[in-house]
Amino acid sequence: MLGYFIGKICKYRLSVCVQNLARAFPHLSYQEINIHRHNFYQNLARIIWENFHPRLVKLHLSESALETINRLQKQRSQTILLLGHYGNWEVITKIPQFTNMPTKALYKPLKNRFLNYLSYKKRTKHGMRLLPAQHALRILLREKQTPSITFFIADQFPGHDNGIAVEFLQQTTFMFSGAEKLARQLNTSVGYVSLQPLNKLEWELDIKPICDNAAATSEGLITKQFASMLEKSIQKDPSWWLWTHRRWK
């Protein structure tokens, strides 16, 4: 019902959603695009509902993700984990319950101070530390000797004059490059985080390695690998990506 209201009544960024889907899947018919559009708004409604009831949402880690977390704890190394706006990305704030290592995530403070306070409080409830995006580089460089896991949502549009151009969903796309630059500067390991819905209110998080020594990689490799992995997640089930974001401008 909420999905119908958002997509059909409010028509929230409907034209952006349809245009993005058509650009990403030019081989699909109009009917097939509409099916993905409908499923997207239904899933968006679920994510919105879950974010209003975060205590009811459960996070599970795949076997490989648990192995990765355990290995990182033993190595006591710095790690950067990249993810996109796919599924309910807010559930990563529950990751501290699976590790003793400090966990951090970048965020952009909201202009409304009261809403920012509520958002900050909800996201840090389980021990996740939030770093304001504009200060993240300075903070992480200062703490580079401290083993930690830092999450970056890395599929935002960075502007045509910034970022790295990659082939993504049938078109040249500029990807946020700040995470890669930081990873190479700190010589961290880098991984890709994927989220899959399980039962209602349950998500499974998986981690796939991108590299162990970022400083040894060529420029753009990490970003291109991330884009490729995210594209595979989207192709598997397009309805969980945030199609209402003005990704291609």
Regions found by a protein language model. Name each.
Residues 3, 18, 92-93, 119, ...:
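Generic structural marker for isolated residues within well-ordered, non-membrane alpha-helices
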